[in-house]
Amino acid sequence: QDASLHIQYVVPQAGTSVKLGEAVMTFYGPLDNTYRYGRAQDAPNLNTRQVNKYSIVTRIVYGSNSFLMTGDAQQETIKKIVARGYDLSAQVLKQPHHGYQDVRLQDKPKGRYVYDSDHKYLIDRTGASIAIISNGYKNVNQTPESNVLRDLSGMDVYQTSDKGTIVVSSDGKNLSVSAQKGGNVPSHAGYVVKQKRTPLMQKVTVQANTKKKMTPLRSDASA
């Protein structure tokens, strides 16, 4: 810290909030008090994964609009936040960790890597309609990974790798998205699979031309 700048700083605590004008930002994480500032200061053994676990996670509410900002949070961090019972609903989700499938090596033999992404339990709880993924120019790391993109399929997904700078604006009621490239056209358009109503098995009585009475079953799709 540069004392000559005379800037007061506060270390946020999970569960506390600050006002940003008329918006309110609530801190959900990190939930671990062993955090060390910087990648190596006072903790030379911290690797990138450990540092990412201490990403600040916040929920911002402005009027009727809400945003969930997750930084580079890893699955351990997100699971702790989910377990706390925080309100995770949001219209806009900043997808954790660039859209990586950051499964741990010990989880791979269990088959988790093949199906759900690490943060599906978070994605399902947000109910978001817009997802933002920060990934590198030319996307050499090929994110988001397929599992993540599949779990985000109900949202409009915007990636910085092909959209450049992405701005989501709110007036407290309405949201708008603009990007450096391609305007408001998403990188991947979301879709919602309409659930088909289950056909009902209806019992009907049929009077035959004979003296016998038949009571067959028929399948009627409800209107």
Q: Model regions: which residues?
A:
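Active-site regions of enzymes building and remodeling cell-envelope glycoconjugates
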Residues: 5-9, 155-157
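Cap/insert and terminal regions of metallo-dependent hydrolase folds
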Residues: 78-165
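A glycine-rich, often tryptophan-bearing local segment used as a flexible ligand/cofactor-contacting loop or short
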Residues: 1
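Core dinuclear metal-dependent hydrolase active-site scaffold
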Residues: 7-92, 164-223
